[in-house]
């Protein structure tokens, strides 16, 4: 494992290795056991999209691992003034031990990896969000103990989260059902791959997708950069909500996950959110532990 650019780059055993290490790091963290695996290491964090969870979890993670993190916005980088990504990659590779980037274009992440000489971590692009899904898988395993025989249901926009969740669910052997409007489906190549490699469905039939689900997941209707589409999206997605009706067809012990931030009474009702708040905030915490595992895998000597 040289980089984390997208979840498709990892096989089942590699994901399990990360989850096992994340579990260990979480246990040590909760029990006051220091683990300075990255003493003397520096992570550069490039943010072209704002974030709460990504910045805080990576910065805290590097500190807990004995290293340090540098926050770099567009205003701090010549890349924001037209410097080619390949030049930025080669320069930062001389100063840093790794780069985490949260940006719009997947190509920018791929270019950093191609032209740089240090590990690159995809903190989010419009195409995928591998770090979040590693935390999701960690949380599912904590609650369900195993991925065997589980049905995973996602309700909402077929966006970067849906793309990575499909890959994560199918890779780990879960059945995966996506409920979304027909014009907002996930990436066609990812859906083709999912059909070839597991049990996968995508339709606008919300209740059929949620039927007998072990995990029900959602995300905001309008992601960052889609603010001008918000009113239109609210009309299109108004029925694509996790509510009592949806939970009524899922399994009795179904868990609910949300990558946050949540817009109550839009993609999820306040009632369902609060009933499953422990799961959702365990999931949020697990961003820290899953990403620390990725950092150790990539940056430790």
Q: Which residues fall in each region the model found?
A:
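Rossmann-like adenosine-cofactor binding region
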Residues: 195-271
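Anion-binding alpha/beta catalytic cores of soluble intermediary-metabolism enzymes, centered on
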Residues: 97-168, 258
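Positively charged, low-complexity intrinsically disordered leader regions
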Residues: 1-56, 60
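Glycine-rich phosphate/diphosphate-binding loop of Rossmann-like nucleotide-binding domains
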Residues: 48-60, 142-218
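Active-site cofactor/substrate anionic-group-binding motifs, chiefly glycine-
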Residues: 42-43, 47-95
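Short, structured coil segments at secondary-structure junctions
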Residues: 65, 95, 115-116, 172, ...
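Adenosine-phosphate binding glycine-rich loop
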Residues: 253-254, 260-301
């Amino acid at each position: 494992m040289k980089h984390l650019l997208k979840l498709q780059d990892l096989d089942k055993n590699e994901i399990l290795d990360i989850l096992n290490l994340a579990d260990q790091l979480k246990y040590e963290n909760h029990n006051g056991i220091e683990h300075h695996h990255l003493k003397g290491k520096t992570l550069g964090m490039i943010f072209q999209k704002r974030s709460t969870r990504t910045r805080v979890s990576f910065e805290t993670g590097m500190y807990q691992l004995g290293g340090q993190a540098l926050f770099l916005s567009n205003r701090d980088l010549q890349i924001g003034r037209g410097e080619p990504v390949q030049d930025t990659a080669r320069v930062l590779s001389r100063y840093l031990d790794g780069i985490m980037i949260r940006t719009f274009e997947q190509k920018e992440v791929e270019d950093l990896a191609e032209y740089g000489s240090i590990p690159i971590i995809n903190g989010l692009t419009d195409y995928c969000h591998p770090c979040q899904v590693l935390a999701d898988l960690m949380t599912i395993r904590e609650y369900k103990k195993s991925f065997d025989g589980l049905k995973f249901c996602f309700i909402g926009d077929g966006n970067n989260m849906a793309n990575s969740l499909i890959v994560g669910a199918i890779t780990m052997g879960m059945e995966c059902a996506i409920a979304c409007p027909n014009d907002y489906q996930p990436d066609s190549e990812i859906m083709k791959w999912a059909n070839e490699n597991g049990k996968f469905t995508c339709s606008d039939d919300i209740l059929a997708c949620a039927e007998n689900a072990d995990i029900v997941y959602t995300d905001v209707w309008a992601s960052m950069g889609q603010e001008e589409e918000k009113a239109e999206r609210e009309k299109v997605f108004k029925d694509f909500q996790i509510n009592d009706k949806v939970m009524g067809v899922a399994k009795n012990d179904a868990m609910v996950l949300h990558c946050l931030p949540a817009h109550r009474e839009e993609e999820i009702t306040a009632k369902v959110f609060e009933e499953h708040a422990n799961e959702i905030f365990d999931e949020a915490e697990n961003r820290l532990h899953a990403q620390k595992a990725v950092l150790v895998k990539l940056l430790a000597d």
